[in-house]
Amino acid sequence: MYTTPDHRITHWVNRGLWGDRTLCDHLALQVDIRPQQLAVIDPANRIELTQGDPLRLTYAELDAASDALALDLIDWGVSHRQRVMLQMPNVVELVVCYFALSKLGVVVSPLPVQYQAHEISTLSK
């Protein structure tokens, strides 16, 4: 499903502000150019958001982590064009999930962490 009208797509493409590159294409380019540069860093208050020590991933590490998660997701039955709701705090693993799901061609529907069972149940119908 595309939600952007064709005329708007044409408008932005003609101005060079919208292209054919995907999220994963941008990651692959950074892995080629600067694999050891930091790509994503946990917030200082990670411990308030979730368990575990703060993480830092380079572009190469982010690519490898998202590849590994994508393979796990395939094993769990997640497939191309499937819709997945994702509810996570703003931590490194969220970025890994987005890239893994994008590599599989999955449609991601992010949910605010404040949503509880009622909201999630309603949205999943």
Language model features by range: what are they?
Residues 1-25:
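Flexible, non-catalytic linker and terminal segments flanking ANL/adenylate-forming cores
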Residues 105:
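Structured binding elements
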